């Protein structure tokens, strides 16, 4: 992966601290790109049962740096358009440009089931009422904001920079 096909390019990866975002970050860093990982919580950790390993953004950033990338971690709630614009402006200010945007942030589900195991604290993104008509508006809004609007806001924020670079 060290062909440097993307040397001099800067990649923005939302939701880049874990899972697929981590994979994108490592792959792009391996191709020579500098990487900005934007995540709601850079300190959150995810345990991968198959590896028995604790992974968090610091780990991914260190792995990308080991591949030769300049790395920037930005903690931001991308469901807020102004916060997204500020995160992208910071990225461009610190890394010089934004050439690649991977909108990977997402999460939360709405499942319509009669029986769902709810944690003791009651915090869940799962609709436990069983029917679509009973799903709370707040839950639908949160899922749409997280999975759709973060992508829209990110694209809207990077577009002016990308247009200016062409």
Give names to the regions the model predicted.
Residues 54-55, 75-87, 137:
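The beta1-alpha1 cofactor-binding region of Rossmann-like NAD(H)/NADP(H)-dependent oxidoreductases
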Residues 3-42:
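Canonical Rossmann dinucleotide-binding motif of NAD(H)/NADP(H)-dependent dehydrogenases/reductases
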Residues 31, 94-95, 108-112, 157-166:
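A short helix-coil junction within the Rossmann-fold of NAD(P)-dependent oxidoreductases
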Residues 107, 119-153:
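Catalytic Tyr-X3-Lys loop
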Residues 62-80:
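Rossmann-fold cofactor-recognition segment
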Residues 89, 145-164:
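Amphipathic alpha-helical dimer-interface segment in Rossmann-like NAD(P)H-dependent oxidoreductases
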Residues 67-72, 90-103, 109, 134-139:
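A glycine-rich helix->loop->beta "capping" turn
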């Amino acid at each position: 992966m060290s062909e440097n096909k993307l040397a001099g390019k800067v990649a923005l990866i939302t939701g880049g601290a874990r899972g697929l975002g981590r994979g994108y970050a490592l792959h792009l860093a391996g191709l020579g790109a500098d990487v900005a990982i934007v995540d709601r919580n850079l300190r959150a950790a995810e345990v991968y049962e198959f590896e028995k390993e604790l992974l968090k953004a610091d780990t991914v950033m260190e792995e990308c740096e080991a591949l030769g990338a300049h790395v920037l971690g930005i903690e931001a709630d991308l469901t807020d358009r102004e916060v997204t614009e500020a995160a992208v402006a910071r990225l461009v200010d610190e890394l010089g440009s934004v050439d690649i945007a991977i909108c990977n942030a997402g999460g939360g589900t709405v499942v319509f089931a009669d029986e769902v195991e709810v944690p003791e604290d009651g915090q869940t993104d799962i609709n436990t009422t069983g029917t679509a008509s009973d799903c709370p508006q707040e839950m639908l809004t949160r899922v749409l904001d997280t999975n759709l609007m973060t992508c829209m806001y990110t694209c809207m924020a990077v577009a002016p920079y990308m247009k200016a670079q062409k």
